[in-house]
Amino acid sequence: MSASSIARTVYIVSDSTGITAETFSQSVLSQFDQVDFKPIRLPFIDTLQKAEETAERINKNAADTGVPPIVFSTLVNPEILARVRQANGVFLDLFGTFVSHIEQALGLKSSPSIGRSHMQADSEKYRNRIDAINFSLAHDDGQFVNQLDQADVILVGVSRCGKTPTSLYLAMQYAIKAANFPLTPDDFERSSLPKTIAPYRDKLFGLSIQPERLSEVRNERRPNSRYATIEQCRYEVAEAERMMRRAGISWLSTTTKSIEEIATTVLQEVGLGR
């Protein structure tokens, strides 16, 4: 962000966790890279007293900065919604904007419910998500390999290319049982996939990364080590990509991609659309 960038406060207001509004706001605000947005999440605004306090906070920010803050809302209760809407902010009602149009299209009235977009702790979907998270944690970095046949996908690549965060994101967001397995210099010397994962060729998806970026990441973990040198990184990346091409494994570079983009590509390429 440049020194001359514009600063603007953003309030993310919800009567539940605020995750939906936060995710939407990040996507929208990312289109304005000349603005230094200051996001503040206000979850569980589920009483009129909390709504009043939220409105006062928004008004104070507007008075202090001289500009009304941007307010993203997924409030459901009409009274709470009305009170926060009265505050001096640029108010964006995410549910109201879309629900009314869908009501017209369907010829039906919606049945508002707080937190409905998120899973209940006793639901089957929630339990599947927890099972997937536990699976991904147990099968991180090739630690446990006895149940790889149960994996939905096995991510492969050199150390520190983004396998672990992608595996956990797939588990948490999509209940995907994602294992990950490292490709090491020993594997490159043998010029073949590790025997542990070779039987699961149809489950494999590769992640790569630019050597320069890999060196930066590894230096944060092991400064001044051979493991982090640009020469070692170039060697490992080149050999890993050669191995994946030879084995016919689809892969992508994680260098400039977010975890969300990587995960979406994995889902599409492996045929795990959710």
From Swiss-Prot:
The keyword Hydrolase does not apply. Its EC number is 2.7.11.33, 2.7.4.28. GO terms for molecular function: ADP binding; ATP binding; phosphotransferase activity, phosphate group as acceptor; protein serine/threonine kinase activity. Keywords: Kinase, Nucleotide-binding, Serine/threonine-protein kinase, Transferase. The keyword Ligase does not apply. Pfam families: Kinase-PPPase (PF03618). It catalyses: [pyruvate, water dikinase] + ADP = [pyruvate, water dikinase]-phosphate + AMP + H(+); [pyruvate, water dikinase]-phosphate + phosphate + H(+) = [pyruvate, water dikinase] + diphosphate. InterPro entries: Kinase-pyrophosphorylase (IPR005177), PSRP (IPR026530). ADP binds at G157, V158, S159, R160, C161, G162, K163, T164. It is an enzyme of class 2 (transferase). Belongs to the pyruvate, phosphate/water dikinase regulatory protein family. PSRP subfamily. Bifunctional serine/threonine kinase and phosphorylase involved in the regulation of the phosphoenolpyruvate synthase (PEPS) by catalyzing its phosphorylation/dephosphorylation. This is Putative phosphoenolpyruvate synthase regulatory protein. The lineage of its organism: Bacteria, Pseudomonadati, Pseudomonadota, Betaproteobacteria, Burkholderiales.
